[in-house]
């Protein structure tokens, strides 16, 4: 699926071997969709042992592999305990500590559904305002990282199934035995908080448990059939079928195996950390100095080929439920190589179907500001957009038309994939049938820029189309066009 999966590591390994370096252990690869944590655990132990053997590190040096890598796949309740804590939770401080990020708080100004009433889906224009001063600076094309909260229903469902959770709102501190097992120390993974707060803001309760987590859970099953089934799911083939069919949340696992008696300390120590979600910023700070705009598709889907329970995207659902003035903990993440050209006279082609349009709104807002307030005339900026139907989900349609009238956008080309009685048209079709000469002129003749934003499958199809186009124009072989392509000013911001 990902054409450049682990590309940096693979390239580095090849180069090192070319330079006659000795490889201590096989290169490890981690796929977050397929047990990255377990893959790293196995690789780390193997590499550590290989390094000790190669460099003659003996036991007299008292070097040991940490228990978390060498211990068997069990969880021992006597190694953990909960103590009450008087410390109130400072959410921003806690999130900053857990994720090592400098957070700031924004407030929701408004939510606007960009789809028409004819659409069954929702894509939001999210307008956030800074608290107090202007706030941190950002550039068009950068991302806003948001720390969402899990759905209340999921959290409550888990709390109702925890065996030792009589006071879910009591602030507690998780303590663990030190390596020697002689005294208790505070676990640094989470700050003192209530179990409800941990499940809401800090812990990932929607990602399917790993095989290792299922193995640890099996000990809490009081029915033998449940324990055996959980053990069976630790086998790769069984696990992958179960995972990709059900994509279960942690609550759904507890519902599937109702005899599980899970203690609170297990949740606090074993559930993965809830990660921030990233969204392309859809505004220019020069154009809207005290605001950040986002373009957010509200994600809902059913598992089991449409027959399973309804699942909701964690962050998009959380955002959709916000009320005006609600706080939003966030931070800015720079995106290397996805900014407007330093030379504004250089032509650009922007390709962004669906919510892939998000960063390009910040581009045209910046160009509008530069034109109106700095007298800068930008080069040709051609936009290629795609959606299902012009009367349902053509995001920012009126704004695009306004940018054309004002000369900010040179042209807008749109492909629709769900027009009744007409063939599906995607952005790569437009490039091939309508813009082949313009693309070649911008990339080859004028050394301009081409930007692609959207999902990985679309980006792959666009890249394939462009390579064929360039190869035909310059009469290049497949290998030659690959080399040439890397020399072009070709920018991608893609997601899974």
Swiss-Prot record:
The lineage of its organism: Eukaryota, Metazoa, Chordata, Craniata, Vertebrata. It comes from Oryctolagus cuniculus (Rabbit). Its cofactor is heme b; FAD; FMN; (6R)-L-erythro-5,6,7,8-tetrahydrobiopterin. This is Nitric oxide synthase, inducible. PANTHER family: NITRIC OXIDE SYNTHASE, NITRIC OXIDE SYNTHASE OXYGENASE. FMN binds at residues 6, 32, 36. One of its GO terms (molecular function) is metal ion binding. It catalyses: 2 L-arginine + 3 NADPH + 4 O2 + H(+) = 2 L-citrulline + 2 nitric oxide + 3 NADP(+) + 4 H2O. NADP(+) binds at residues 121, 300, 355, 388, 417-418, 424, 426, 428, 461. Its EC number is 1.14.13.39. It is found in: Cytoplasm, Cytosol. Produces nitric oxide (NO) which is a messenger molecule with diverse functions throughout the body. In macrophages, NO mediates tumoricidal and bactericidal actions. Also has nitrosylase activity and mediates cysteine S-nitrosylation of cytoplasmic target proteins such PTGS2/COX2. As component of the iNOS-S100A8/9 transnitrosylase complex involved in the selective inflammatory stimulus-dependent S-nitrosylation of GAPDH implicated in regulation of the GAIT complex activity and probably multiple targets including ANXA5, EZR, MSN and VIM.
């Amino acid at each position: 699926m990902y054409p450049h999966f682990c590309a940096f590591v693979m390239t580095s390994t090849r180069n090192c071997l070319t330079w006659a370096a000795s490889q201590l252990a096989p290169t490890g690869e981690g796929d977050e969709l397929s047990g990255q944590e377990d893959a790293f655990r196995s690789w780390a132990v193997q590499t550590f042992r290989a390094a000790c053997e190669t460099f003659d590190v003996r036991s007299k040096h008292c070097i040991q592999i940490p228990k978390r890598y060498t211990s068997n796949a069990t969880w021992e309740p006597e190694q953990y305990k909960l103590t009450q804590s008087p410390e109130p939770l400072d959410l921003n401080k806690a999130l900053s500590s857990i994720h090592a990020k400098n957070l700031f708080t924004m407030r929701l100004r408004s939510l606007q559904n960009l789809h028409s009433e004819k659409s069954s889906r929702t894509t939001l224009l999210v307008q956030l305002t800074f608290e107090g001063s202007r706030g941190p600076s950002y550039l068009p094309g950068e991302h806003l990282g948001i720390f969402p909260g899990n759905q209340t229903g999921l959290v409550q469902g888990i709390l109702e199934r925890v065996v030792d959770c009589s006071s879910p709102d009591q602030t507690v501190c998780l303590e663990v035995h030190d390596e020697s097992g002689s005294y208790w120390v505070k676990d640094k993974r989470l700050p003192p908080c209530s179990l409800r707060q941990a499940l809401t803001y800090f812990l990932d309760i929607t990602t399917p448990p790993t095989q290792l987590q299922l193995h640890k859970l099996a000990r809490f099953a009081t029915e033998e059939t449940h324990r055996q089934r959980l053990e069976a799911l630790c086998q790769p083939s069984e696990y992958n079928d179960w995972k990709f069919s059900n994509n279960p949340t942690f609550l759904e696992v507890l519902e599937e195996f109702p005899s599980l008696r899970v203690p609170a300390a297990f949740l606090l120590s074993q559930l993965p950390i809830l990660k921030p979600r990233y969204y392309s910023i859809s505004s220019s700070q020069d154009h809207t100095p005290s605001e950040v705009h986002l373009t957010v598709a509200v994600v809902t889907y059913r598992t089991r080929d449409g027959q399973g329970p309804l699942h909701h995207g964690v962050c998009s659902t959380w955002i959709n439920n916000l009320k005006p003035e609600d706080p939003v903990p966030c931070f800015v993440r720079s995106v290397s190589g996805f900014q407007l050209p330093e030379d504004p006279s250089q032509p650009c082609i922007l390709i962004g179907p669906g919510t892939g349009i998000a960063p390009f709104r910040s581009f045209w807002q910046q160009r509008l500001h530069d034109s109106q307030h700095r007298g800068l005339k930008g080069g040709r900026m051609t936009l290629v957009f795609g959606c299902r139907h012009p009367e349902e989900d053509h995001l920012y349609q009126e704004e695009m038309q306004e940018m054309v009238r004002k000369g900010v956008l040179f042209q807008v080309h749109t492909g629709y994939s769900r027009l009744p009685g007409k063939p599906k048209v995607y952005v790569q079709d437009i490039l091939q049938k309508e813009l082949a000469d313009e693309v070649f002129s911008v990339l080859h003749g004028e050394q301009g820029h081409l930007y692609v934003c959207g999902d990985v499958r679309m980006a792959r199809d666009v890249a394939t189309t462009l390579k064929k186009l360039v190869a035909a124009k310059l009469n290049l072989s497949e290998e030659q066009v690959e080399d040439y392509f890397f020399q072009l000013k070709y920018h991608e911001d893609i997601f899974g």
